[in-house]
C-alpha cells in the first residue's frame, strides 16, 4: 500500500473500470449501512463522472442522476443536466419520474460538492448550502420510510444541519469511509426512515 490513499484508490478504480475512486466510498457506505437496497428507485445528485452511478446501477431498479456537468451515458440511467439551485429542477425531476412511472423514490443520495477553495470555513459553508438543497429535494420526493445519504465538509454548522433535518427521519448516522483522505474534513451523513407528512 502506498502512503497516499489517493494513489491506492485511483489505481484500484482504473483496474475495476470504475469512473472515479468515489465509487469505493459508496460501496463502503452501502455495505455497512444499507442506505440503498436491491430494487430501490434512487435520485442521485452530483453524479458526474459516474462512479457512484455505476455502483448504484448494480443495485437499484431505477436511477435518476443529476449533475451540472455532462455525464457519459450509463445504460438504464436517466440523466438530467441541471443546476439543483434552479427552480426548474423540480419540473425536470417531476417529468423524469412521471415518464419512468415512479411516484416517489426510496432513496436520495448525493456526492455533490463545489470545487474546493482550500479555505475550510468557506468550503464548509458551501457544503452546508448544497446539503440544504439536497434535503429540500429529498423531502419532496422520498416515500415514507425512505433514506438520504449526502456528503458534507464537517464544520461548525454540521450539528445545526443535522438538528434541522433529523426530526423528519427515524435516525441518522455519520461516517467517513476509508477511501476518504485522512486529512479531509469530508464526512457522509445518512438519514434513515423518512417520516412523510
Curated annotation (Swiss-Prot):
One Gene Ontology MF term: rRNA (uridine-2'-O-)-methyltransferase activity
Main location: cytoplasm
Subcellular location: Cytoplasm
Alphabetical list of InterPro entries matching this protein: RNA_methyltr_RlmE, RNA_MeTrfase_FtsJ_dom, rRNA-MeTfrase_E, SAM-dependent_MTases_sf
Catalytic residues (UniProt): 151
Enzyme kind, highest EC tier: transferase
Record-linked Pfam families: FtsJ
Role played: Specifically methylates the uridine in position 2552 of 23S rRNA at the 2'-O position of the ribose in the fully assembled 50S ribosomal subunit.
Protein name, UniProt field: Ribosomal RNA large subunit methyltransferase E
Organism of origin: Thermoplasma volcanium (strain ATCC 51530 / DSM 4299 / JCM 9571 / NBRC 15438 / GSS1)
Phylogenetic lineage: Archaea, Methanobacteriati, Thermoplasmatota, Thermoplasmata, Thermoplasmatales
Gene it is expressed from: rlmE
Amino acid at each position: 500500500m502506498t502512503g497516499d490513499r489517493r494513489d491506492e484508490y485511483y489505481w484500484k478504480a482504473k483496474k475495476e473500470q470504475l469512473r472515479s475512486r468515489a465509487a469505493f466510498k459508496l460501496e463502503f457506505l452501502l455495505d455497512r449501512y444499507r442506505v440503498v437496497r436491491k430494487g430501490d428507485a434512487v435520485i442521485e445528485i452530483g453524479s458526474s463522472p459516474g462512479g457512484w452511478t455505476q455502483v448504484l446501477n448494480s443495485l437499484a431498479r431505477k436511477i435518476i442522476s443529476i449533475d451540472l456537468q455532462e455525464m457519459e451515458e450509463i445504460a438504464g440511467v436517466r440523466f438530467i443536466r441541471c443546476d439543483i439551485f434552479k427552480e426548474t429542477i423540480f419540473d425536470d425531476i417531476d417529468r423524469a419520474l412521471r415518464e419512468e412511472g415512479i411516484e416517489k423514490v426510496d432513496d436520495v443520495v448525493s456526492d455533490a460538492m463545489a470545487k474546493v477553495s482550500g479555505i475550510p470555513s468557506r468550503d464548509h459553508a458551501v457544503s452546508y448550502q448544497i446539503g440544504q438543497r439536497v434535503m429540500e429535494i429529498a423531502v419532496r420526493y422520498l416515500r415514507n420510510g425512505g433514506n438520504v445519504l449526502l456528503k458534507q465538509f464537517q464544520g461548525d454548522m454540521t450539528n445545526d444541519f443535522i438538528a434541522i433535518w433529523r426530526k423528519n427521519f427515524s435516525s441518522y448516522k455519520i461516517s467517513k469511509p476509508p477511501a476518504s483522505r485522512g486529512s479531509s474534513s469530508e464526512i457522509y451523513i445518512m438519514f434513515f426512515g423518512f417520516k412523510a407528512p
